[in-house]
Amino acid sequence: MMKIIAFVGMPASGKSEASRIAAEMDIPVIIMGDVIRKEVLKRGLEPNDSNTGMVATDLRKCEGMDAVARRCVSQIRETGSELVVVDGVRGIAEVECFRQEFGKGFILISIYAPLEVRFSRVQKRGRSDDMNSIDGLRQRDERELSWGMGEAIEASNVEIENSFTLETFRKDVNDVLNNYLKSNSEK
């Protein structure tokens, strides 16, 4: 059975870092945000937080709250891998989409970090769609919560706290991923 491990969490909680760890373990990674960023560019827009948020909201409004997840399903299947990581679930409709597609093979891991910690990370990472103030991060949180992010986080199978050192977080993510790798290889 194919296993999908998806990361959910508020912006800058550590989803991308967790996905990097998975990639280092040779687990294919599908980044849901890339679907949005691709659509932003397709529409000829500047890839900033405002446009990214607008396009993400528009896709969900026009195609349904699971629009991004549905666009990722074929990418997941095309990997041909028994274990795939999905970075960036944003709402409960996406969780439901993946659970419908992959059944018990879908595992949702929430990553938690406090607002102040997340904002300090945003300031360091320098992505074009990042916000430049803590109020901007709060607004992004509110936008993503409006997509059902809170319900998605509550629906997670496992939570990893990312409030400590990078080394601690990497170890925690490694432990969780290795647990699923091990259970996958035993079948």
From Swiss-Prot:
GO terms for molecular function: ATP binding. Belongs to the UPF0200 family. InterPro entries: NTP_hydrolase-rel, P-loop_NTPase. This is UPF0200 protein MA_4660. Transmembrane segments: none annotated. SUPFAM superfamilies: P-loop containing nucleoside triphosphate hydrolases (SSF52540). Pfam families: AAA_17. It comes from the Archaea. The keyword Nucleotide-binding applies. Keywords: ATP-binding, Nucleotide-binding. ATP binds at G9, M10, P11, A12, S13, G14, K15, S16. The keyword Transmembrane helix does not apply. It comes from Methanosarcina acetivorans (strain ATCC 35395 / DSM 2834 / JCM 12185 / C2A).
